[in-house]
């Protein structure tokens, strides 16, 4: 399912006393404390209904889309920059949202999707596709923010690797790691040869298909 727009309702809590105690009280009311910052404006402490936020968090696209926060009737265009979850139960405990300004570049981590895994010659030869990243930090203006980056691995042979610089980027998008002075063009996926265990397993299967000779069978019966 593709979502083109996310909108959440929020309440301004800036006039209230802030702190751990206040956050606990909000959570007891099924509200998630959060903050909006950036864009040259003052931070705003807010709260969001937990069921609204949880519903949006079900979609991967929520983490790489421009979001609309409706705070007491005033709309704020934001991206989510941090989300704290309960360590055991996983529900959201606090969220940080950064304002986006039209034409002003933002840094975002977007998901990476790998396609063509089954079609890859390396996979068909028994190789193992090892993916080393789940997301990549990019820089772009808000209107050019991609939902995800797709990496086509359908042509990978055993021993092949794919680096950051090999990614075909949408227009206006750059990779943060490659835009730094000490650019690190790291590997993000490689096709490894079959493991020793897998090779041995194949050998065992092949051996089990070979019938025992009469001589070997007689020897076992006689105990010789």
Curated annotation (Swiss-Prot):
Pfam families: Ribosomal_L25p (PF01386), Ribosomal_TL5_C (PF14693)
Gene Ontology biological process terms from the UniProt entry: translation
MF terms in GO: 5S rRNA binding; structural constituent of ribosome
InterPro entries, sorted: Rbsml_bL25/Gln-tRNA_synth_N, Ribosomal_bL25/Gln-tRNA_synth, Ribosomal_bL25_b-dom, Ribosomal_bL25_C, Ribosomal_bL25_long, Ribosomal_bL25_short, Ribosomal_L25_dom, Ribosomal_uL5_bac-type
Keyword tags: Ribonucleoprotein, Ribosomal protein, RNA-binding, rRNA-binding
GO CC annotations, alphabetized: cytosolic large ribosomal subunit
CDD domains xrefs: Ribosomal_L25_TL5_CTC (cd00495)
Highest taxon, organism lineage: Bacteria
Task performed by this protein: This is one of the proteins that binds to the 5S RNA in the ribosome where it forms part of the central protuberance.
Family note: Belongs to the bacterial ribosomal protein bL25 family. CTC subfamily.
Subunit structure: Part of the 50S ribosomal subunit; part of the 5S rRNA/L5/L18/L25 subcomplex. Contacts the 5S rRNA. Binds to the 5S rRNA independently of L5 and L18.
Protein's recorded name: Large ribosomal subunit protein bL25
Source organism: Psychrobacter arcticus (strain DSM 17307 / VKM B-2377 / 273-4)
Gene encoding the protein: rplY
